[in-house]
């Protein structure tokens, strides 16, 4: 269920301050964050944000198509290694 339009987008204040500081300074270093719940806003376009996935920070380069999505959508938390192969099928 999407967030109500009258409430506006959610973004953690500490992340917003880091984004504003990077835009003002023209800094291209990745911004480290644990805030997967924050929404991507237009001020973030062109920045690289390192989003924590529970184990490491995954660098995410923000483009204009990402606006309105959450940062956590671009940093997968689970790795799928495939199902175990059936040993009986291999012998035949």
From Swiss-Prot:
Coiled coil: none annotated. GO terms for molecular function: rRNA binding; structural constituent of ribosome. It comes from the Bacteria. InterPro entries: Ribosomal_uS19, Ribosomal_uS19_bac-type, Ribosomal_uS19_CS, Ribosomal_uS19_SF. Keywords: Ribonucleoprotein, Ribosomal protein, RNA-binding, rRNA-binding. It holds the Pfam family Ribosomal_S19. One of its GO terms (cellular component) is small ribosomal subunit. GO terms for biological process: ribosomal small subunit assembly; translation. The keyword Ribonucleoprotein applies. Belongs to the universal ribosomal protein uS19 family. Protein S19 forms a complex with S13 that binds strongly to the 16S ribosomal RNA. This is Small ribosomal subunit protein uS19. It comes from Shewanella amazonensis (strain ATCC BAA-1098 / SB2B). The gene is rpsS.
């Amino acid at each position: 269920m999407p967030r109500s339009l009258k409430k506006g987008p959610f973004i953690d204040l500490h992340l917003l301050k880091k984004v504003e500081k990077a835009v003002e300074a023209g800094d291209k270093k990745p911004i480290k964050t644990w805030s997967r719940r924050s929404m991507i806003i237009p001020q973030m376009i062109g920045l690289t944000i390192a989003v924590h996935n529970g184990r490491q920070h995954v660098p995410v380069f923000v483009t204009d198509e990402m606006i309105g999505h959450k940062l956590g959508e671009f940093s997968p938390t689970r790795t799928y290694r495939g199902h175990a192969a059936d040993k009986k099928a291999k012998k035949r």
